Design a protein with these regions (language model features):
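A structural signal for short hydrophobic beta-strand segments in well-ordered beta-sheet cores
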Residues: 139-141
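A short, Trp-centered hydrophobic/proline-enriched beta-strand micro-motif
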Residues: 117-128
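A short core secondary-structure module
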Residues: 124, 149-186
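Structural signature of FAD isoalloxazine-binding scaffolds in flavoprotein oxidoreductases
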Residues: 65-74, 111, 132-136, 179, ...
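Glycine-rich beta->alpha junctions and the first turn(s) of the following alpha-helix
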Residues: 3-12, 52, 80, 186-281
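Residue-level signal for inorganic ion chemistry
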Residues: 9, 20, 74, 103, ...
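C-terminal helix-coil-helix/basic helical segment that borders enzyme active sites and/or dimer interfaces
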Residues: 27-38, 250, 254, 258-261, ...
Length: 303
């Protein structure tokens, strides 16, 4: 396998890296952790101004019309900066679902607003603490209304619309719907999770208006398709975060002295850093393969 990013994609990576270096230090993430804010509006607005929220949205709907590989390089830099923004929920999941499975009218209605950051979207799948499966989806859709409960929903408190996974009572198939979270009969409760860096919410739908999306006969396969694509992008975020952690550990090992020597000069510390480096590079290789499958539509993506 001979895979690498193009020069244009590397330039995009550098542009995003510079913006985040200048505007998203770790102090920004700490501020979100220690406050009632759900995300950094300043960093989000900067990403919007760069056009990144419309990276993979077709140009006809106001996006940049780029692809999965461009999103991969953006994701790596977001992870490196631990950027406290709803990018994964809104771009990797919500927007991607509409691009793939929205009707023409739904694309015309929602994508331009998502491209310019006027709206934030999320993906509402789980209903319990267990792994979501086709069998445990209890939220129902019937006659343009949905009823049920989703928990936890990442970035559920700050999102404007949600792609909600439901069971269509007309045919008993799993389907996707679009719900305006600001409308009546939608209740949201912010919840605490093991990850305080992300906003999570419980969302309750009580005869809420919903738009049925066009998943054809795919059913649960459509959900797997969206999640598999997002998993590759999240892997790139994790690579960026892991590499940043390694660099921080290396800098500390060179700056910290014990018994008159840099602790980085001790073999045990060198081994720890070397092990971290090897694991990161292995993860990078796997992620690059995932990016290639994502770009080419290969069958190995689901693996």
């Amino acid at each position: 396998m001979n895979f690498d990013f193009s020069e244009d994609q590397k330039m995009l990576k550098e542009q995003v890296s510079k913006f985040l270096s200048d505007n998203c230090s770790l102090d920004v993430a700490r501020d979100i952790l220690e406050s009632d804010k759900t995300y950094s509006e300043e960093v989000w607005r900067g990403l919007v101004d760069l056009g990144l929220t419309g990276t993979a949205i077709p140009e006809e709907y106001g996006g940049l019309g780029l692809g999965a590989l461009e999103l991969c390089v953006v994701a790596e830099e977001l992870g490196r900066a631990a950027a406290p923004v709803p990018f994964s929920s809104s771009v990797y999941l919500g927007t991607e679902a509409i691009v793939k499975y929205g009707t023409d009218s739904q694309k015309e209605k929602w994508l331009p607003k998502l491209a310019v950051g006027e709206l934030i979207s999320t993906f509402a799948l789980p209903e319990t603490n267990s792994e979501p499966t086709e069998k445990n989806i209890k939220t129902t859709f019937s006659n343009g209304k949905i009823n049920g409960r989703k928990i936890p929903v990442a970035d559920g408190s700050c999102s404007d619309i949600a792609i909600v996974v439901v069971k269509n009572t007309d045919n008993d198939h799993i389907a996707l719907t679009i719900v305006d979270l600001t409308s009546e009969n939608v209740k949201r409760n912010q919840i605490s999770t093991l990850d305080p860096s992300r906003d999570h919410a419980e969302i309750i739908f009580e005869n809420s208006d919903a738009e049925l999306m066009d998943t054809g006969d795919e059913g649960w396969g459509a959900i797997e398709n969206i999640l598999n694509s997002a998993a590759v992008l999240m892997a790139f975020e994790q690579i960026g975060g892991a590499e940043a952690s390694l660099n921080m550990a290396k800098d500390y090992a060179l700056d910290r002295y014990a018994f008159g020597r840099q602790i980085g000069s001790y073999q045990a510390i060198k081994h720890k850093l070397a092990d971290m480096y090897v694991k990161i590079e292995l993860a990078r290789s796997n992620s690059y393969y995932g990016a290639m499958m994502l770009n080419d539509g290969g069958d190995d993506l689901k693996i």
